Amino acid sequence: MSYTIYPAIDIRAGKCVRLEQGDYNKETIYGESPYKMAKSFQDAGAKWVHVVDLDGAKAKRPVNDEAILTIAQKLDVPVQVGGGIRTEQDIDRYINGGVARVVLGSVAVYQPDFTKQMLAKYGEQMAIGIDARDGYVATEGWLETSHVKAEDLAAEMARFGAKTFIFTDIARDGMLTGPNIEACVALSKAANANVIASGGVSSIADLAQLRAASLAGAIVGKALYTKRFTLEEALAEGEL
């Protein structure tokens, strides 16, 4: 997997928002139309778009799925989706609806056998999202912290066939404090797989460091919305 920049769209109540450290009480709305935002990313040159159903993550089922399917069907670039995906039916609906890659998060912790089956069925169309707080996996829209270490979960999921992981350091998400490169690299080594870094990217230099660390990509959200840099600048640096 080559290094890829994933502009991020987090959807809550049908709008494009960003949270700080996953806190639903610390929300900023950046747009009324997720599709228009996604289209603007595509027009700027994005090779992928990353979409999260924040309501879904909390409700443990897809909530903004119609908006997400609209994005997947109308864009010409592949779309990666996470948030509230818990059943085979959820996965089927997204994949059959045009989503290129589905991200499983909490379910990987609580239903490893099911996750193994889904990895066997969907292969490269699946990614495992590992969101960590102080090294331990957080679940249920980050409202709970498990007793499972991020690296242990990554190693187990890699044995089950996972090839792509998305690692988020919750303490840095939405804070523009720089990504946790050390943790991303440790996870990549534990799983011997592709790791996409998420959380904390604040500058073009951060993207360059992630690329230099041989990671598979970076998910960029708040830095774009707050105009720390443009997507065109990020793509020029990151995807050479």
From Swiss-Prot:
Keywords: Amino-acid biosynthesis, Cytoplasm, Histidine biosynthesis, Isomerase. Its main location: cytoplasm. The keyword RNA-binding does not apply. Pathway: Amino-acid biosynthesis; L-histidine biosynthesis; L-histidine from 5-phospho-alpha-D-ribose 1-diphosphate: step 4/9. One of its GO terms (biological process) is L-histidine biosynthetic process. It is an enzyme of class 5 (isomerase). GO terms for molecular function: 1-(5-phosphoribosyl)-5-[(5-phosphoribosylamino)methylideneamino]imidazole-4-carboxamide isomerase activity. InterPro entries: Aldolase_TIM, His_biosynth, HisA_bact_arch, Isoase_HisA-like, Isoase_HisA-like_bact, RibuloseP-bd_barrel. The active site is at 10 (proton acceptor), 131 (proton donor). Its EC number is 5.3.1.16. PANTHER family: 1-(5-PHOSPHORIBOSYL)-5-[(5-PHOSPHORIBOSYLAMINO)METHYLIDENEAMINO] IMIDAZOLE-4-CARBOXAMIDE ISOMERASE. Belongs to the HisA/HisF family. This is 1-(5-phosphoribosyl)-5-[(5-phosphoribosylamino)methylideneamino] imidazole-4-carboxamide isomerase. It comes from Shouchella clausii (strain KSM-K16) (Alkalihalobacillus clausii). The lineage of its organism: Bacteria, Bacillati, Bacillota, Bacilli, Bacillales. The gene is hisA.
